[in-house]
Amino acid sequence: MNESKILNDISEIKTLMNRSSKFLSLSGFSGILAGIYAIAGAYIAYIKVEDYKTHSFRYSKVLEMELFFIAIAVLVLSVSTALLLSYLKAKKNNEKIFGKGSRNFSFALLTPLIIGGIFILLLIRLKIFVIIAPTTLIFYGLALLFASKYTLGSIKYLGFAEVLLGLLAMYFIGHGLLFWVIGFGFFHIIYGTLMIFEMKNREKVNE
């Protein structure tokens, strides 16, 4: 048995271990679309807020509910798109969408998101709206950092960027919507585009 064959065998074993323990079917296109959804949602929210300022007789509770449903709509669209595109990519790569890797990834991602979601609901209940945008960015970034162990390692850079942006948003209070657009909109589009190029380069190397 020559040295090159041994190295090939080791490489194949590492690949199999990665496939079983990591979720490698994230789609760059889902990141781009999530960014577009976020920008569209933020634009609609901006219009609603400006309309409320113009017509101050409107009940603030109505505005709160409208903004809440806009956020939920963006979240549902983003998650649905990510699940669909990841499923199609996993099917193409013969990877189990509900395998050990995806379970590890989901648990690591959802734990900070659920904790952050509960914290944000408490902020809403206490009517502390000014730090909601920074809080969403920070908890989302932490979720990506935790989940990066179980997927493409490069996702941790997006996580760091989201956390830092959230801290900046906490410092520059009153510009939450702008930071939200940058973090959930433009950062997602940039990262999704880079992920597509990264995956194409990997495919070329493996050919």
What are these regions (language model features)?
Residues 1-27:
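N-terminal juxtamembrane cytosolic/stromal segments of multi-pass membrane proteins
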Residues 22-113:
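Selected alpha-helical membrane-embedding segments in polytopic membrane proteins
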Residues 19-26, 60-67, 97-101, 122-132, ...:
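Membrane-interfacial loop-to-transmembrane-helix junctions in polytopic alpha-helical membrane proteins
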Residues 29-32, 69, 104, 131-138, ...:
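Alpha-helical transmembrane segments of integral membrane proteins
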Residues 35-45, 75-82, 113-117, 137-140, ...:
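Helical transmembrane-bundle signal
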Residues 46-54, 87-94, 124-128, 149-153, ...:
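Transmembrane helix-loop junctions in multipass membrane proteins, especially transporters and channels
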Residues 140-207:
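Terminal transmembrane helical module of multi-pass membrane proteins
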Residues 94-148, 152-155:
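Membrane-proximal helix-loop-helix units in multi-pass membrane proteins
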